């Protein structure tokens, strides 16, 4: 895989999509026959496909050793994409020692949904509180607070149609 020049700033969604598209086009996410780059006598690079027999021999050797690679990525490609940081995606040359935890919980989930997780002091990656729930008796039905926090007047009667 050969990379194109990217600006050294923050990676945009388009550049990440382009990176993923490059991986897919190179057959990394599909089980295609691997390609190798070879130099000819005049110094130009050409793409050489491994034969099916070589690929099958490598696959059977890996299976005997108990190693089944999911993805084959060139290390240089990973070094070029180090700038990308996300809590959900990690580009690395090394395989992880164990799968990541789905939730970072210290105790069982509380059934009371009205309490905010921020108040409990626990962090759950990927989970964000939308709003605080407030439970109280309504005594004044003529005014309310809208979703933007503004005080609004509640209409006592709404007329519909011709009257």
From Swiss-Prot:
PROSITE patterns: NGF_2
Propeptide: 4-119
Gene3D superfamilies hit by this protein: Cystine-knot cytokines (2.10.90.10)
Pfam families: NGF, NTF3_N
Designated gene of the protein: NTF3
Lineage, opening ranks: Eukaryota, Metazoa, Chordata, Craniata, Vertebrata
Keywords on record: Cleavage on pair of basic residues, Glycoprotein, Growth factor, Secreted, Signal
Compartments, record wording: Secreted
Function: Seems to promote the survival of visceral and proprioceptive sensory neurons.
Glycosylation sites: 112
Organism: Epicrates cenchria (Rainbow boa)
GO biological process: cell surface receptor protein tyrosine kinase signaling pathway; modulation of chemical synaptic transmission; negative regulation of neuron apoptotic process; nerve development; nerve growth factor signaling pathway; neuron projection morphogenesis
GO molecular function list: growth factor activity; nerve growth factor receptor binding
Record bears the keyword Zinc: no
Family classification: Belongs to the NGF-beta family.
Signal peptide, first to last residue: 1-3
GO cellular-component term (any): synaptic vesicle
Protein name (Swiss-Prot/TrEMBL): Neurotrophin-3
């Amino acid at each position: 895989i050969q990379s194109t020049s990217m600006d050294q700033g923050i990676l945009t969604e388009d550049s990440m999509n382009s990176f993923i598209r490059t991986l897919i086009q190179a057959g990394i996410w599909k089980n295609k026959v691997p390609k190798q780059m070879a130099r000819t006598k005049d110094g130009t690079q050409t793409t050489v496909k491994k034969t099916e027999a070589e690929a099958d021999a490598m696959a059977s050797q890996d299976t005997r050793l108990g190693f089944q690679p999911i993805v084959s990525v060139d290390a240089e490609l990973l070094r070029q994409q180090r700038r990308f940081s996300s809590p959900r995606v990690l580009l690395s040359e090394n395989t992880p020692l164990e799968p990541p935890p789905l939730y970072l919980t210290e105790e069982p989930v509380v059934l009371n949904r009205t309490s905010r997780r921020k108040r409990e002091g626990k962090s759950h990656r990927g989970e964000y509180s939308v709003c605080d729930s407030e439970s109280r008796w309504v005594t004044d039905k003529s005014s309310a607070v809208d979703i933007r926090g503004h005080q609004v007047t509640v209409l006592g009667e709404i007329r519909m149609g011709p009257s």
